[in-house]
Amino acid sequence: MSAFHDQFHTALPLLTADNYRETSPSAWEYNCIAWAAGVTDAWWWPTPGRYWPADVPREETLAAFLAAFALLGYSAGASPLLEPEVEKVALYAVGQTPMHAARQLPDGTWTSKLGSGIDIQHDTLEAVAGGIYGEVVAILGRNRSRQPSA
């Protein structure tokens, strides 16, 4: 088992050596929400001292996270299946408290930023579910030809 697995196995019990690969080294500059939004120079979270869209309530609620992604052109209700013309983001929560976001890649796999740790590509949404990130509670989509910048 790798050092990564030693550190994260309990937190992400469904992530195995067979269902993910590391794509970027650890970086403190951004987190999973920023990464899902396509941003690598800010840590997105609705707490003081972190970036959060100005017109969105600074609260750790699903409604606030949906509103933040809506400003980027995303809407809820997308399917997790690959649709080449639709860029997708999955929001994870424990209860109704958002904990994580993943973005679908053009090949249908998903990419996640693990806190201040590594970026990974994982085969399924379930690979990072079931632990500290909770379960997928919303899948958002936007047309690839209509992408407001973050």
Task: Describe the residue ranges of each PLM region.
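...with weaker cross-activation on analogous glycine-rich loops/strands in unrelated enzymes
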Residues: 58-117
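Aromatic- and glycine-rich peptidoglycan recognition patches
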Residues: 104-150
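Ribonuclease/tRNase effector modules and their secretory precursors
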Residues: 3-12, 20-21, 130
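Domain-length accessory/inserted modules outside core catalytic folds
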Residues: 26, 42, 50, 62, ...
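Short, charge-rich amphipathic segments
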Residues: 1-2, 36
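Generic structural signal for residues positioned in beta-strands
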Residues: 31-35, 89, 109, 138
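Cysteine-nucleophile protease catalytic domains, especially the papain-like/related folds used
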Residues: 14-68
